[in-house]
């Protein structure tokens, strides 16, 4: 629909209706010396076709996984997303919905969120899940703040190798809150040292945090880490990859008090870094301390099932100064995508995705380490990604592979380390894996 400007008569009628004689009356309070007295220096008007051509030209400078074979990981993964996911979430009643404060007119949205919460509880083996957080990093940061509130303590121990980006967000949250100190456990073979962790524990530790699998893709000794936390009265927080839970033990099964995760692999595209989905689950005793929105199921006066936002006194729109967090509009659409994705795959489907990731990652690691100069940096078990020691700097390899249409991985020098972090999802075919190996061999 074209934009039709107001006529002089339209403007006169509007001014007259508010008691003004001219537009200058509306800006009389702005000192003349700071007013712009010339026309704005804007681009000349373009047609729709010209705008599309301009934007396509600008976007062509980007390289995306849509046109490359991607082995990039480190927190965002190139998984296959069934076309039905987009078809369902694009329905207008989902796509344009806002926060469902009025339950009587939002039953569809509320039920969808309730189903998402139920799926997260089953996947993570926890009692309660909220409606979502902004992303996995903010979910973990909120979990740490929650642990400090519950325990009254101020220290947090990072038991293993946490994503440096998540760690940066956590540091920002703690600095903004005015309290909290982070202690990093020492690493051995790319995972946290259990003995080192025990040496860091004391009665001031509010929470022990572990990422499973960790940033290197390696599997941490989560049961021993959880036991060390419980022995000292600290809460045990696990940031678990949701896809890995298709084959790995769920956080609830080994005693997590709070389990969070990055939900991007569940039906959400990489989206150049966002929007993403923060998964947040807790045990029942902590339900009134959980941040974010909660959808509950109830009965109406006629005995029919209904869905509502429950325990709202925790939230900032009720009692801002006493809210458990100030998250407002959450990632409900991303959460819906995760719920639709899991519904389409089912229990067996998510298990198959996890198995394919593991098998293909181990196949690729085996093939690459047959090449001269390439070796695994760590020998700990891994799930979907692994760190390579390479004969050439990782940046050189990544640049060379780009010319062959391959994202070779993540250069760990970006976080002050050495090595190439390579991720493999179920999307990668045997031919793509072998082609990557051949391309590396040709360097």
Curated annotation (Swiss-Prot):
EC code(s) of this entry: 1.4.4.2
InterPro entries in the record: GcvPA, GDC-P_N, GDC_P, PyrdxlP-dep_Trfase, PyrdxlP-dep_Trfase_major, PyrdxlP-dep_Trfase_small
Domain of life: Bacteria
CDD domains referenced in this protein's UniProt entry, alphabetically: GDC-P
Reactions this protein catalyses: N(6)-[(R)-lipoyl]-L-lysyl-[glycine-cleavage complex H protein] + glycine + H(+) = N(6)-[(R)-S(8)-aminomethyldihydrolipoyl]-L-lysyl-[glycine-cleavage complex H protein] + CO2
BP GO terms, sorted: glycine decarboxylation via glycine cleavage system; nucleoside metabolic process
Subunit and interaction comment: The glycine cleavage system is composed of four proteins: P, T, L and H. In this organism, the P 'protein' is a heterodimer of two subunits.
Protein name: Probable glycine dehydrogenase (decarboxylating) subunit 1
Species of origin: Chlorobium limicola (strain DSM 245 / NBRC 103803 / 6330)
């Amino acid at each position: 629909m074209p934009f039709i400007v107001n006529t002089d008569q339209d403007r006169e009628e509007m001014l007259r209706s508010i008691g003004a004689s001219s537009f200058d009356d509306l800006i009389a309070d702005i000192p003349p010396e700071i007013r712009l007295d010339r026309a704005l220096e804007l681009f000349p008007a373009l047609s729709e076709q010209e705008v599309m051509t301009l934007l396509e030209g600008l976007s062509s400078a980007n390289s995306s996984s849509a046109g490359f074979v991607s082995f990039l990981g480190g927190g965002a993964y190139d998984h296959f997303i069934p076309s039905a996911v987009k078809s369902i979430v694009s329905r207008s009643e989902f796509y344009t919905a806002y926060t469902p404060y009025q339950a009587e007119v939002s039953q569809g949205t509320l039920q969808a969120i309730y189903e998402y919460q139920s799926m997260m509880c089953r996947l993570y083996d926890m009692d309660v899940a909220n409606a979502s957080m902004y992303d996995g990093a903010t979910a973990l940061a909120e979990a740490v703040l929650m642990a400090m509130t519950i325990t009254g303590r101020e220290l947090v121990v990072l038991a293993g190798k946490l994503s440096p980006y998540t760690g940066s967000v956590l540091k920002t949250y703690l600095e903004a809150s005015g309290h909290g100190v982070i202690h990093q456990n020492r690493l051995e073979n790319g995972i946290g040292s259990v003995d080192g962790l025990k040496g860091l524990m004391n009665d001031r530790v509010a929470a022990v945090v572990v990422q499973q699998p960790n940033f290197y893709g390696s599997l941490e000794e989560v049961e021993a880490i959880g036991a060390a936390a419980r022995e000292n009265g600290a809460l045990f927080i696990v940031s678990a990859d949701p896809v890995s839970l298709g084959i790995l033990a769920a956080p609830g099964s080994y005693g997590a008090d709070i389990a969070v995760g990055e939900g991007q692999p569940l039906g959400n595209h990489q989206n150049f870094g966002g929007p993403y989905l923060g998964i947040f689950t807790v045990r029942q005793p902590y339900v009134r301390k959980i941040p974010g929105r909660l959808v509950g199921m109830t009965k109406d006066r006629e005995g029919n099932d209904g869905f509502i936002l429950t325990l709202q006194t925790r939230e900032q729109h009720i009692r801002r100064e006493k809210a458990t967090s100030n998250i407002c509009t959450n990632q409900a659409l991303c959460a819906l995508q995760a719920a639709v994705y899991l519904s389409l795959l089912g229990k067996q489907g998510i298990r198959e995705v996890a198995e394919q990731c593991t098998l293909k990652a181990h196949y690729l690691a085996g093939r690459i380490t047959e090449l001269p100069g390439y070796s695994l940096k760590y020998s700990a078990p891994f799930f979907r990604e692994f760190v390579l020691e390479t004969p050439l700097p990782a940046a050189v390899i990544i640049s060379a592979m780009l010319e062959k249409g391959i994202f070779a991985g993540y250069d760990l020098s970006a976080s002050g380390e050495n090595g190439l972090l390579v991720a493999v999802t179920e999307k990668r075919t045997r031919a793509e894996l072998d082609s990557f190996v051949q391309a590396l061999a040709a360097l």
